[in-house]
Amino acid sequence: MGFSSSLSCSAMGALIVGCLLLQASNSNAQLRPDFYFRTCPPIFNIIGDTIVNELRTDPRIAASLLRLHFHDCFVRGCDASILLDNSTSFRTEKDAAPNKNSVRGFDVIDRMKAAIERACPRTVSCADIITIASQISVLLSGGPWWPVPLGRRDSVEAFFALANTALPSPFSTLTQLKTAFADVGLNRPSDLVALSGGHTFGKAQCQFVTPRLYNFNGTNRPDPSLNPTYLVELRRLCPQNGNGTVLVNFDSVTPTTFDRQYYTNLLNGKGLIQSDQVLFSTPGADTIPLVNQYSSNTFVFFGAFVDAMIRMGNLKPLTGTQGEIRQNCRVVNPRIRVVENDDGVVSSI
């Protein structure tokens, strides 16, 4: 079964959310949803079919592709710099602490890019492929659809140092989270709370959970905001001095579904990582009313999520003649230098 035939009735009903919010979003004027309408009509089906096929063997890939988009956009904007491998000119962002042995889905993006290049050579940017893949991943997992503004171009460099400092930590306090989001231009409480809802599916490694289970902030005690029953369960899954790479579901109730359960979990002290639970457990925080709203109304959460995703997708995009359209998402295009020999013959090298 292909991408178009896999859409459920509930997902199709969520189309309304995206349509209502497109006009309300402060979309970059140079980005538009119909950017590839004439130049690469099959782009959505190619990306969607790739994800559908991947989900058959890797139910986690949808959440991973959404996270890949987030980690790309927070470092100099949504420019696919995260996809670049090491070169003589720069160090890859994949080696940065928040990404190494954590961010995944690169091979899936490679397959999408290869298929798109066969259909529409040198037309679609890797940055737009990541953006579309994140949107379709949310939709296929039961979340909303929205018209994705397109027309980004790809960076010709990576930003290893910035990736080490710009991305929020799973151990962040609410103040630190707000600073990280504001630093990239996402300065509304709804940006933080709605985008954090991306943790309604997917998994995290035990190494990002265990400090709050056994020695929260150096107290030799667990995080007091943890639900006692949930604490017991997490200690079973992530024993002290155990394997830090073991994976735990962000949402133990509906682990592969994009829904509002994440916020219900926060109300019950069942946020998996510290940077999730602080949205509700920080006294007097302006994020608390939003957690309450999103936990009780799917339409409100989906609407806020779509709006925040469009805002994040519009962070400092490269457009027009900026950057390039990479032929291979892992490397910058080879530079062609035109030379003329003594006989006046022009060639490129």
Swiss-Prot record:
Heme b binds at H199. Its EC number is 1.11.1.7. Pfam families: peroxidase. Ca(2+) 1 binds at D72, V75, G77, D79, S81. Ca(2+) 2 binds at T200, D251, T254, D259. Binds 1 heme b (iron(II)-protoporphyrin IX) group per subunit. It is found in: Secreted; Vacuole. The modification Pyrrolidone carboxylic acid is found at Q30. GO terms for cellular component: extracellular region; vacuole. Residues 1-29 form the signal peptide. The active site is at H71. Disulfide bonds join C40-C120, C73-C78, C126-C329, C206-C238. Its cofactor is heme b; Ca(2+). There are 73 peroxidase genes in A.thaliana. Belongs to the peroxidase family. Classical plant (class III) peroxidase subfamily. This is Peroxidase 23. It comes from Arabidopsis thaliana (Mouse-ear cress). The lineage of its organism: Eukaryota, Viridiplantae, Streptophyta, Embryophyta, Tracheophyta.
